[in-house]
Amino acid sequence: MLRVLSSDEHREAVQQQNILAVEGTSCELCTESPTSNYRCETRGKGRDRGQDRVKRPMNAFMVWSRDQRRKVALENPQTQNSEISKQLGYQWKMLTQAEKWPFFEEAQRLQALHREKYPGYRYRPRRKARPEKSDKLPPADASSTLCSQLHAGERLYAFPYKDGCTKAAHSGMKDQLYSSSEPMSITSSLLEPGPHRTSTTLQDSPEDLAMQLSADAPLYRTLELGVSEAYFAW
């Protein structure tokens, strides 16, 4: 007798058929394709490729130091390998040519065997990984902007000098002008010439400033009129 399947049972049967079909196609791909089959069988064996790397034949120093290194390591077990290499290098230099000659002959024999075993061998040194530079240089626009601001400040606060004042007095006033940040603080620094220094604050009235300027007028004749009007205009 035939059984009528419900909608849920029919849906489950279709899903199972789809799963079986996907598994069958994946197995066929692994068996039919030689490259995929090689990947399936040799998965995880990529690290073993480094073991097949052909080593260089030993030279005379390596032939001599092979036994000497063992002796030094047994006599000094706490010595590091780098220190042992330094000692062996110094001892090798102290040997005469007659003492080195047997090791040169052995090295030539090993090189001949190496050429016979690996006729197409070529030495390929491993390249060291370059460290990534994390520090980034500042953009060139920042330095050029800073220089332009400095030049602009020099043009703004530069003023000439005459015979009435010395260069030292003007250089001192220039330093005071550069160290100030507000116009009123600049005027207060200018109103302190040295021996007869007066105290000027932001609370002083325009009349007091005018009186002080009239009293100190001989010392500040060299200041330009445009600068004084720009700083003392209310």
From Swiss-Prot:
Record-level Gene Ontology MF annotations: calmodulin binding; DNA-binding transcription activator activity, RNA polymerase II-specific; RNA polymerase II cis-regulatory region sequence-specific DNA binding
Kindly state which keywords UniProt assigns to this record, in alphabetical order.
Answer: Activator, Calmodulin-binding, Cytoplasm, Differentiation, DNA-binding, Nucleus, Sexual differentiation, Transcription, Transcription regulation
Cell compartment(s), UniProt: Nucleus speckle; Cytoplasm; Nucleus
Q: Where primarily located?
A: nucleus
Q: Which GO terms describe its cellular component?
A: cytoplasm; nuclear speck; nucleus
Q: Name one GO biological process term.
A: positive regulation of gene expression
Matches recorded under PROSITE patterns: HMG_BOX_2
Region called Disordered, residue ranges? 121-143, 184-203
Which CDD domains does the UniProt entry name for this protein?
HMG-box_SoxA_SRY
Lineage top rank: taxon: Eukaryota
**Which Pfam families does UniProt cross-reference here?**
HMG_box
Alphabetized InterPro entries for the sequence: HMG_box_dom, HMG_box_dom_sf, SRY, SRY-related_HMG-box_TF-like
Keyword Cytoplasm among UniProt keywords:
yes
Summarize which parts of the chain are annotated to bind DNA, as ranges: 54-122
Q: Where is the signal peptide?
A: none
Q: Which family does the record claim for this protein? A: Belongs to the SRY family.
Q: How does it assemble?
A: Interacts with CALM, EP300, HDAC3, KPNB1, ZNF208 isoform KRAB-O, PARP1, SLC9A3R2 and WT1. The interaction with EP300 modulates its DNA-binding activity. The interaction with KPNB1 is sensitive to dissociation by Ran in the GTP-bound form. Interaction with PARP1 impaired its DNA-binding activity.
What function is annotated for this protein?
A: Transcriptional regulator that controls a genetic switch in male development. It is necessary and sufficient for initiating male sex determination by directing the development of supporting cell precursors (pre-Sertoli cells) as Sertoli rather than granulosa cells. Involved in different aspects of gene regulation including promoter activation or repression. Binds to the DNA consensus sequence 5'-[AT]AACAA[AT]-3'. SRY HMG box recognizes DNA by partial intercalation in the minor groove and promotes DNA bending. Also involved in pre-mRNA splicing.
Q: What is this protein called?
A: Sex-determining region Y protein
Species of origin? Felis catus
Question: Which gene specifies this protein's sequence?
Answer: SRY
